[in-house]
From Swiss-Prot:
It is found in: Plastid, Chloroplast. The record marks 25 as: Deprotonates C-terminal active site Cys. This is Thioredoxin. The record marks 32-33 as: Contributes to redox potential value. PANTHER family: GEO12009P1. One of its GO terms (molecular function) is protein-disulfide reductase activity. The keyword DNA repair does not apply.
Length: 107
């Protein structure tokens, strides 16, 4: 499963109303650490394709959702399950850290 881009308009449908846990990558094109974590997010999407959905949202183009979730630094990775935010990882973290965080929410 590839990583989908979501917008302020599609966030509710793609993330909140999703039956699977969803990993949301809040990022911006000018953000160096975002570019560092992007391949990790892509790998997670491939490895967990049957268990989770992975989406990215550009905070510059979609400020409403970023503000709603209090995004103050990027990259911020949030995990949603059953429409609720259940965890947040801030910064460019190693794949192992992200994977262990995700594993807590995969049934």
């Amino acid at each position: 499963m590839s990583v989908s881009q979501v917008t302020d308009a599609s966030f509710k449908q793609e993330v909140i109303n999703n039956n699977l846990p969803v990993l949301v990558d809040f990022w911006a094109p000018w953000c160096g650490p975002c570019r560092m974590v992007s391949p990790v997010v892509d790998e997670i999407a491939e490895e967990y394709e049957s268990s989770i959905k992975v989406v990215k949202i550009n905070t510059d183009d979609n400020p409403t959702i970023a503000a709603e979730y209090g995004i103050r630094s990027i990259p911020t990775l949030m995990i949603f399950k059953a429409g609720e935010r259940v965890d947040t990882v801030i910064g460019a973290v190693p794949k192992s850290t992200l994977a262990s965080t995700l594993n807590k929410y995969i049934s």
